[in-house]
Amino acid sequence: MKRGEIPKPGGGQRKLGIPTVLDRFLQQAVAQVLQKRLDPTFSEHSYGYRPHRSAHQAVAQAQQYVAQGLDWVVDLDIEKFFDRVNQDRLLGELAKRVADKRVLKLIRAFLKAGVLEDGLVSPTDEGTPQGGPLSPLLSNLYLDALDQELTKRGHRFVRYADDCNIYVQSPRAGERVMKGISAFIARHLKLRINAAKSAVARS
């Protein structure tokens, strides 16, 4: 893959891993097959990178929660999510749902391919590079454990890619949820919450 960068809305640069033409073709083919198998298993509260789901639907669901009196929101932003996905955990989750070892081997090769930057190849031991057709699907697979945990705890939430909003009745409840879910993300997903971009606030 080649390294590319685009400006981030909040400032700075977002790094992309741009696959070769052949790799993009192969990733697209694998993504189409896996999407049909994996997407029906994902949470109804997940809206990003999914067929027949949109940001407009996510906003409508959030407005419904607020109308029900859940007018405090725990706004979670996962720090450098795409760069820090634990590949072993991701491949383990994939192996639970995909039996074809050839597909698993191919995806492992995509993840471990390395990135070409300034004529040098850097290894990719963590993360799922943004810019490839498979990354959106793999990101939803990785964060499905978060969706399931939030559902198990009875939370009302909306997740769009790596941004997750949880709706609660009070700031005290929000702080409690922030602490508990941050610990879950660190312990089970091997990721961290971006404290500067995460907050409990009135909707």
Q: PLM features: residue spans?
A:
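A short catalytic or substrate-binding loop motif that flags glycine-/basic-rich loops and adjacent residues
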Residues: 9-10, 22
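Electropositive, glycine- and tryptophan-enriched low-complexity nucleic-acid-binding patches
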Residues: 27-45
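Duplex nucleic acid-engaging cores and interfaces of nucleic-acid transaction enzymes
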Residues: 21-22, 26, 31, 59, ...
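Conserved phosphate-binding loops in nucleotide/dinucleotide-binding enzymes
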Residues: 15-18
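Conserved polymerase palm-domain catalytic core
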Residues: 1-5, 9, 41-203
